[in-house]
C-alpha cells in the first residue's frame, strides 16, 4: 500500500469539507513520533489565501477528520499544523495484508514504463578503477527498484570500445612487433601507457595511430581482429568485477560506442539538413541559445570535428536515437559523473530540437559526486596512483573476514570467508548508496565496516537478529489477527507500511539513499521495539503479533537490501 497516498486522500476530503479543496495539503511524516505519524502543513498557506485565521481553519480540518477509519486523532499544533495519529486497527489490518503478500504490501506502478538506464560504461583496454564504482552500483540499485516497481528495465553498458586509444594501441603493437602475441589486460595497460607517451611526443606515431583508427572504422580485418581481442579481454575483466559486486549487468547488456559507428555520419547529415548543425571553422556545430559561453554567445555543441572525425556528442546522439527508436524507451537515465552535466544537458536539448527525443519521453542525467580520501582529495593509493577496483574489493573482503573472525573465533575458515565476502562487499556498496549521490563522500574503511551506525554490517546484523528470534520461537500463527497496543508496536507497524512510499520515491527521483535511510530507520526502530516489547516472553495475541512485526521487519530488510544490491545472512 502507499501509506502517504492513503492518508493524503483522507486529508483531501477534510480540506474539501473545510472549504479549501484546491489548496495543497503538504503532508509529511512527523519528526517526533510522540506527535503522531503524519503532519499536515498546508493549512497556513490556505488560510493566508482565504484570509482566515490559520488555527481556526486547521480546527475545521481536524474536526472533518473525526470518526475516520484511517486516522485516530487529528490535533492542531502551533500556528496551524495538524498532527495525525493512525488507527491501530488500520495499521494491524494492513500489516496482515503485507505479511500475506509476496511483495510485502508494495503494489506495482499502474503506469509501467520502458526505462533504458545507462550505467558503469568504463573505457576498455584498461582495468576498472574506483572511479567506476559509483556509476556501477548506483545504476544497479536504481534499475533494481524500477524493475521491482513493475517497469521494463533495459540496462545499457555503454563501454568506450572505439576511437583514438585503440588506434594508438594497434600502432604501438605493430611497431613493437607484438600484434600477433597473446596478452592479458595488465599487458594492455602497460602498452597503452607507452603508446600514449609516443602519441603525445611523436607526431609521426600520432599520424599512424589516426590511420589505424580510420582502418578500424573502415572495417579492416587485421585491425578489427586486434580490436576484438582488446575488447574481449577488457569485457571479461569487467564482468568478473560485476560478478564480485553482485551487479545485474550481463554481457548482453554491453552496447559500446562501436555499435553506433555506422549511424554517426547519418546523424550529422540529418542535423545539417534540419538546419541545426552548421559549419564552423571546418567542424559541424550545433549552436544552442539555451547555453552561453564566456562571451555570452550561444554555446557550441560540436558533432563532427574538422577533418570528419566524430566525438562523444556524435555517438551519444546516435545512441539516444537507437534507444528511443529501437528499444522504445519511455524514459532514459544516464548515471554519469556530475562533471558531465553540461554535455548531457546539451545532448538532450539538441535531441529535442532534432525530434530525436519526443516530449513524451523523459531523459535525465543522474549525476554523482567524487569518492574522496580522508585527506579530502580524490581517493588514490599512497603512491598517488588510481586505485584498481579489484584491489579495493579484495581488501574489503579481507578486512571484513578479519573482523568476522575476531568477533566469532569459533567459526571455520570457509564460513568466515563466506560471511566476510558478504559483509565486505555490502559495506563498500552501502557506504556509497547511503549518501546523497550528488555529494562527494569520504571513503573510510573503519566507518563503513562498523557494526554500529548507518552501515551495511549494522543492517545485516539486524536481519540476523530477526532470524535468531524465529529459530527460538517455535510455533506461531502468521494469519492470526494482529493486535497493536504498545506505542513502539504501532510506530514500527506504521514505518513498515511506508515501504511502497519509499520505493516509489526512489523510482521517481533516482536517489537510492532514500531507501538506505528508510532501512536504517526500520533497523533502529526494531532494536528499540525488541528491547521495550519482549517477543518470546510475551503471551497470547501479544506474542503472536510481535512475531508478525518481526517477520515483516526481516522481510522488509532483506528485500530492501536486495534492491540496493546487498546480500543478507541468517547467521553472522
Curated annotation (Swiss-Prot):
Q: Name one Pfam family in it.
A: DALR_1
A Gene Ontology cellular component where this protein is annotated is: cytoplasm
Reading the lineage from the top rank, the first entry is Bacteria
Q: What catalytic reaction does the record list?
A: tRNA(Arg) + L-arginine + ATP = L-arginyl-tRNA(Arg) + AMP + diphosphate
Instruction: Give the enzyme class.
Output: ligase
User: One biological process GO term for this chain?
Assistant: arginyl-tRNA aminoacylation
Enzyme Commission no: 6.1.1.19
Family per record? Belongs to the class-I aminoacyl-tRNA synthetase family.
State what protein this is by name.
Arginine--tRNA ligase
The organism encoding this protein is: Neisseria meningitidis serogroup B (strain ATCC BAA-335 / MC58)
